[in-house]
């Protein structure tokens, strides 16, 4: 029996290691062997209460390439919720009577979890709820790491930039902590350091981690360099100018890197990765974004199919 059938996917913590491996294995099979009719006759709602480019287009492309019909909206201001003041609960209650699954993004933390209470058993897939969770980003990150490194264990992973507010690094650390032998290097200004609850979680699992002031300190040791954008609005102007210069990756910084090392980024990048990095064999952020199709296809296929034969 497929353990993800009709399951809500709200947080990466909703998935066990075995379920993560099932999603990644399914993603690899779908990448190697497209299934254009796998979700034929299924109707999926794409409900984006908050603006999105990559996530919405990636999800909707995933739906279409599996043969599903797609309904929904990309701007809630033109819906009854936006124009007439309808509650999220009522909106989800109605939409769930039309479709087989609901993909939703919402600016309010906890909105996706709330939606599960009103969906009548129709699975909710969280495409991002405020600064809280973005589980499908984590799935495509894991898929890319496994694809480039051949494993998800015994890896050295550096995370750089805004580690305090960046939901992608929190979820990725939690997911990778389910696999043995990984070591983390956290590179961030003090004001944007990894939250204590993540560090405590790693300590409880006996996972080694360390904090560093610059990328150069760890370049020769890591398999994955996960860059994030330092958000200007989080720092005072003088501190931002200093931090911005300190956490920029250039091609010249990669000279001592391992040959297998890949640079990842959840995108959009601003100027934290110089464009000269794009031409190096280490740059993998555009392929990473492309892998979102297969990770999301896998999740949709598993949630909607009792038995998945690929």
UniProtKB/Swiss-Prot annotation:
MF terms in GO: amino acid binding; aspartate carbamoyltransferase activity
Keyword Transferase: yes
Keyword Transferase: yes
Gene3D superfamilies, A to Z: Aspartate/ornithine carbamoyltransferase
Catalytic activity: carbamoyl phosphate + L-aspartate = N-carbamoyl-L-aspartate + phosphate + H(+)
Biological process per Gene Ontology, one example term: 'de novo' UMP biosynthetic process
Binding site for L-aspartate: 84, 167, 229
Keyword annotations of the record: Pyrimidine biosynthesis, Transferase
InterPro entries: Asp/Orn_carbamoyltranf_P-bd, Asp/Orn_carbamoylTrfase, Asp/Orn_carbamoylTrfase_sf, Asp_carbamoyltransf, Asp_carbamoyltransf_Asp/Orn-bd
Residues noted as binding carbamoyl phosphate in the record, renumbered to the chain: 54-55, 105, 134, 137, 267-268
Pfam families: OTCace (PF00185), OTCace_N (PF02729)
Alphabetized SUPFAM superfamilies for the sequence: Aspartate/ornithine carbamoyltransferase (SSF53671)
Pathway assignment: Pyrimidine metabolism; UMP biosynthesis via de novo pathway; (S)-dihydroorotate from bicarbonate: step 2/3
EC numbers: 2.1.3.2
Enzyme class: transferase
Annotated Gene Ontology cellular component terms: cytosol
Family of this protein: Belongs to the aspartate/ornithine carbamoyltransferase superfamily. ATCase family.
Quaternary structure, from the entry: Heterododecamer (2C3:3R2) of six catalytic PyrB chains organized as two trimers (C3), and six regulatory PyrI chains organized as three dimers (R2).
Role, per record: Catalyzes the condensation of carbamoyl phosphate and aspartate to form carbamoyl aspartate and inorganic phosphate, the committed step in the de novo pyrimidine nucleotide biosynthesis pathway.
NCBIfam families: asp_carb_tr, PRK00856.1
Name assigned to this protein: Aspartate carbamoyltransferase catalytic subunit
């Amino acid at each position: 029996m497929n353990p993800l059938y009709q399951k809500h996917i709200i947080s990466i913590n909703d998935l066990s290691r075995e379920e993560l491996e099932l999603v990644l294995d399914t993603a690899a099979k779908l990448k190697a062997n497209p299934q254009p009719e796998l979700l034929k006759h299924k109707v999926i709602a794409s409900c984006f209460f908050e603006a999105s480019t990559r996530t919405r287009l990636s999800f909707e492309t995933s739906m279409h390439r599996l043969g599903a019909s797609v309904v929904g909206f990309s701007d809630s201001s033109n819906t009854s919720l936006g124009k007439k003041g309808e509650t999220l609960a009522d909106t989800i209650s109605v939409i769930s009577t039309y479709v087989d699954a609901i993909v939703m993004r919402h600016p309010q933390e906890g909105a996706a979890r709330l939606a599960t209470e009103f969906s009548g058993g129709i699975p909710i897939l969280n495409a991002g709820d405020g600064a809280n969770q973005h589980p499908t980003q984590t799935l495509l990150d894991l898929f890319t790491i496994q694809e480039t490194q051949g494993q998800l264990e015994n890896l050295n992973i550096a995370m750089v930039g805004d580690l305090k507010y960046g939901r992608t690094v929190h979820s990725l650390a939690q997911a990778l902590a389910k696999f043995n032998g990984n070591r983390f290097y956290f590179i961030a200004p003090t004001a944007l350091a990894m939250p204590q609850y993540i560090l405590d979680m790693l300590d409880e699992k006996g996972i080694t981690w360390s904090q560093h002031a610059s990328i150069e300190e760890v370049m020769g040791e890591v398999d994955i360099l996960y860059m994030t954008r330092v958000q200007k609005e989080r720092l005072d102007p003088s501190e931002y100018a200093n931090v911005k210069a300190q956490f920029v990756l250039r091609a010249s910084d990669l000279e001592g890197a391992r040959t297998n090392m890949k640079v990842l980024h959840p995108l959009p990048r601003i100027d934290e990765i110089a464009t000269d990095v794009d031409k190096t064999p280490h740059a993998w952020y555009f392929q990473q974004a492309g892998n979102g199709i297969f990770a999301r296809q896998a999740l949709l296929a598993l949630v909607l199919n009792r038995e998945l034969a690929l």
